[in-house]
Amino acid sequence: HHQMTKLRKCGLVTAQVDGKWHRNILRGGSMAAATSLVESNALAVLEIRLSELAQMVEPSETRMAIAAEEDERAFSIRISEPGPTIDGCDAACALVRDLGLAGESQREGDTLARDLLVELSSAQQPITILVLSERLSESRGRVSTVIDRMRSAGLVERVPMIDRIPQDVFSGLVRQLDARGEDWLMTRGGLGRLDEKVSKALVDGASKGSLDIDTVRGIISTVTITDQRVLLNTLGGRMPYGFRLAGADGASVSNRVMRLAERSLRRVRTVSQRLEESLSGNI
């Protein structure tokens, strides 16, 4: 019964009532037809809901300046038609609930998912988990959980905070020089892998106390981003990451999610066709 309820809910199966009997049948009379109906309905509903999201997103010329990392996580989004209004829940709150961004067991009065979506929709630059948790007065764990749901839905993507590298390299240099000395910096600290002029300028500046973040930025400006990230790692730091909406405007975000949904539904259609061929003995 539980599984049949799920099949009816997703639209693959419908029930015909004959007196006291409920007969469950595939919509359209076949797996391929049922899948086609589900696909058409899902894309139509999703397009409507994403148009609501697009109106929330502030266009930005700087949001997409940094290339995002490739995200291999599985696409997952809940597609639900607009439901009845709930007291204390505005349009943005209803949208995150219907898209599954608030989770399966949202607590009454919990607006974290809504607040995060609003915050990211207006952000002009990627924002770290730490900054988001401080702005919303929430734990980093809860913020990270909601961000992961948004990433799975294709709404949000993670990007390296390139502008933060000089700051973290400076902190690592000063800390490791005091703790381990110049020899360690040139060997295990990773400076020996860089051009001699670059490594010498960094070590001399750190030793004389004349180094600051802007100076580090100028010195490593000729170093590739890949080597900057390696240097940061060998100095004991970690590449800082931020999160942003996956588009410069609402239309871009909506188009990305629609592409991911269409790709997933094509896979479902392919599986249904193969299943039908198998059942009919054509394979």
Q: Where are each of the predicted segments found?
A:
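Basic amphipathic alpha-helical segments that dock to polyanions
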Residues: 3-7, 116, 132, 143-156
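A short, conserved structural fragment
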Residues: 8-16, 151-165
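Short, Lys/Arg-rich nucleic-acid/phosphate-binding segment
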Residues: 17-23, 109, 160-172, 235-241
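Amphipathic alpha-helical dimerization/coiled-coil segments
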Residues: 30-76, 181-283
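Short alpha-helical segments that sit at the start of domains
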Residues: 69-115
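Short amphipathic alpha-helical elements of helix-turn-helix/winged-helix folds
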Residues: 115-123
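Short acidic, hydrophobic short linear motifs in intrinsically disordered regions
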Residues: 123-135
